[in-house]
Regions:
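Conserved catalytic region of serine esterases and O-acyltransferases that act on ester linkages
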Residues: 208-302
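Bacterial N-terminal signal peptides
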Residues: 10-20
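Serine-dependent acyl-ester chemistry module
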Residues: 61, 74-77, 96-97, 112-133, ...
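Structural recognition of the beta-strand scaffold that forms the well-ordered cores
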Residues: 33-37, 65-70, 108-114, 150-155, ...
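Serine-esterase "nucleophile elbow" of acetyl-processing enzymes
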Residues: 23-83, 87-88, 98-106, 110, ...
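Substrate-gating cap/lid alpha-helix
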Residues: 161-194, 218
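Oxyanion-hole/transition-state-stabilizing segment in secreted/luminal serine hydrolases
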Residues: 37, 47-49, 78-81, 87-131, ...
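Bacterial N-terminal signal peptides that target proteins for export
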Residues: 2-11
Length: 302
């Protein structure tokens, strides 16, 4: 009975992940400079690495130039709840650094996953919702003005709490934010509906994706990556986080993501309580090229 139940759960997840939300393919990513923007979930980088890993593994003849540039606590709305970070500092807003990021990195493609911090964990409110919508619009406008060719909005992940009658569940706010994003129609911009995919997958299992309700664990990050890849028509083979992370290719891809993230974040500069002024990039890309050579050696064995 337990096996049958697990099979039904896997079927629900498979059905969720095999329906692309727009007509795209990996050729729109190959050979492009790709930036992932977001909050602590993106800065943690799990789903960014899983995405980069599968692209590298499944398409060894194509190159994908990926930069994970998320910042913990960040919003698009510019809002912050009282006592954030123990009252030490308000939430950072992307627009403090976005101009520098676009100028320095010059991305062709931008993925952006925001929303979970933007409602500041309170009831749905017209002003807060408007601030989020304005932030999304501003992000799209600034990216397009900087020459970004493709913008991919990723609807927010779920707030991983069980709904109880008469008790406020913050996920209801994120559901509204995601629904609004899904209605957007802008040239050069597409939306990947992570929220619905994650909600369906979570409802089909008993274990949480996020122990603290906000930050997904490895299984949640893998689901995020699969949702993104499926939107590009990628057929992702089954694998657990443990088996994937044991792959030497994954380890080098993760090393490259971490290396670039830390050095490029400092090169761009940011404010999160303290201000990190922009620093020289130095030999960051020379070292990145060495890691890429190891990745290519694994992808193209002699």
């Amino acid at each position: 009975m337990k096996i049958m139940k697990q099979c039904r759960h896997m079927l629900v997840i498979w059905l969720t992940l095999t329906l692309p939300s727009f007509a795209q393919n990996v050729d729109s990513l190959a050979g492009k400079k790709i930036v992932f923007l977001g909050d602590s979930i993106t800065q943690g980088g799990g789903y960014v690495t899983f995405t980069a890993y599968y692209l590298a593994k499944l398409y060894p003849q194509k190159n994908f130039d990926i930069y994970g540039l998320g910042l913990s606590s960040e919003t698009l709305s510019g809002l912050s709840e009282e006592g954030h970070a123990g009252g030490k500092f308000p939430r950072p807003c992307l627009f403090e650094r976005l101009g520098r990021l676009l100028e320095k990195v010059k991305p062709d493609v931008v993925f952006a996953c925001y929303g979970i911090n933007d409602g500041i964990y309170k009831l749905l409110d017209a002003e807060r919702f408007a601030a989020f919508r304005n932030g999304v619009t501003k992000l799209i406008e600034q990216c397009k003005a900087a020459g970004v060719k493709e913008i991919l909005l990723i609807t927010p992940p779920i707030f991983d709490a069980s709904s109880k009658a008469g008790v406020f569940n913050y996920d209801s706010v994120l559901t509204e934010y995601a629904a609004w994003e899904m209605m957007l129609k802008v040239s050069g911009m597409h939306v990947i509906d992570l929220h619905t995919a994650m909600r369906k997958a979570r409802d089909a299992r008993t274990e949480v994706f996020s122990k603290d309700r906000v930050h997904p664990g490895e299984e949640g990050h893998l689901l995020m990556a699969k949702t993104i890849l499926t939107a590009f028509g990628v057929s992702v083979p089954f694998g657990t986080p443990a088996t994937i992370k044991a792959d030497p290719l994954y380890q080098q891809v993760d090393l490259l993501r971490r290396h670039r993230s830390s050095h490029w974040m400092n090169h761009i500069g940011y404010t999160r309580g303290n201000t990190v002024a922009p620093q020289p990039l130095g030999d960051t890309e020379m070292e990145a090229a060495k890691i890429q050579e190891k990745i290519d050696a694994i992808r193209h064995p002699k």
